[in-house]
Amino acid sequence: MSDTHLSTQKFADFPLHKEVHQALNEAGFEFCTPIQALSLPILLEKKDIAGQAQTGTGKTLAFLVATFNHLLSTPIPAERQLNQPRAIIMAPTRELAIQIAKDANLLAKHTGLKVGIVYGGEGYEVQRKVLDKGVDILIGTTGRIIDYVRQGVINVSCIQAVVLDEADRMFDLGFIKDIRFLFRRMPDAKSRLNMLFSATLSMKVQELAYDHMNEPEKVEIAPNEKTSKNIKEEIFYPSMEEKMPLLLSLLEEDWPEKAIVFSNTKHSCEKVWSWLEGDGHRAGLLTGDVPQKKRLRILEQFTKGEIDILVATDVAARGLHIADVSHVYNYDLPDDCEDYVHRIGRTGRAGQKGISVSFACEEYALNLPAIESYIQHSIPVTSYDSDALLDDIPPPVRIHRKPSTHTRNTRDRGASRPQGGQRSGPRRHDRTRRHS
């Protein structure tokens, strides 16, 4: 991991509880990222914050350190039942909740504090048994948390710390009523430490903060830069007929180690996945129709490198936090400007470099002016040579038929594999991009 995203502020300089310091040291955290350096001094004074920061900036560790330190240094309410949570961390998606829980368990090692996670889609009774045994810090999605609150499994009347992560996505997914429901059942805002983080501090997000928090201080990281300088952006103008050949040619040329291809609809994602599979790429498909267990398996394969390319819709990809994504391909330009920022923010994280490639086809090119206005810069245009596009593309596989590994060639991920992978037919060696 590159250290170029770190500040000169050390965690050791903060008056943290010794068990928190020990966990940070063992995990290899020495220097703070900017959001950590700005937010922790405020939070350690037990003041609320509303932080603006993109994913990959270290905000998760910021609110986890503050939460653990707050619970370790604050007396437990006398009326609190032993198995009831003292802190709640709410996330918009189960994948984000799972990632937060993994990070929380790193800090929990020496503290004696128990971490629990709940989310919809699976394991209702299993999760309930964990809650019955008792948790100090509850991490989860709002819908499942509310289910347990309404059934009397969870009591939030003694909550001492609250985190609302990716608040803007909470609005997008329609969870704000659920959040307000939970806030109204917690102690007064002045009686707890409140933390809100969002990629954008829109008026509706700020209104939520001021309604349910105690005069939160705003903390903003590079508020004028909606996209990271670590991401190289480029855009192509393909015809509809050349859109798929261009994508396959660029994948052949770039040969990304880990890439995400975004498309606007489930049908389009299935089409892209079918062509990638037919061309021998190790691809995974994430749409709203993918069952939760299969979804988690695909994400695990992608994280481990067993899958190289993830094809996803915006809704299905929300909350994903996967390290080392080298390329993002916008097969379709998104209709929502904020989705463009969230999409390309999957790469170029934690100080690493990333590449974003977008297609402005006839159907979605009209979205470009609004996107460029929102990100406050023009996306560099790259032309391409139609004659250099791949012309030996195999047919797509059927979406409901798992391709046989014995009848198709797949990408050889070995270090000695030739550029373009091992396929039965020759590939063109022409360069697709034409730079002026």
Swiss-Prot record:
Region (Disordered): 392-436
Catalyses which reaction(s): ATP + H2O = ADP + phosphate + H(+)
Annotated SMART domains: DEXDc, HELICc
InterPro entries documented for this protein: DEAD/DEAH_box_helicase_dom, DEAD_box_RNA_helicase, Helicase_ATP-bd, Helicase_C-like, P-loop_NTPase, RNA-helicase_DEAD-box_CS, RNA_helicase_ATP-dep_RhlB, RNA_helicase_DEAD_Q_motif
Annotated Helicase ATP-binding domain residues: 40-219
Keyword Endoplasmic reticulum: no
Positions occupied by motif DEAD box: 165-168
Pfam families, per the entry: DEAD (PF00270), Helicase_C (PF00271)
Function field: DEAD-box RNA helicase involved in RNA degradation. Has RNA-dependent ATPase activity and unwinds double-stranded RNA.
NCBIfam families: PRK04837.1 (NF003419)
The protein, known as: ATP-dependent RNA helicase RhlB
Organism, scientific name: Shewanella halifaxensis (strain HAW-EB4)
Taxonomy of the source species: Bacteria, Pseudomonadati, Pseudomonadota, Gammaproteobacteria, Alteromonadales
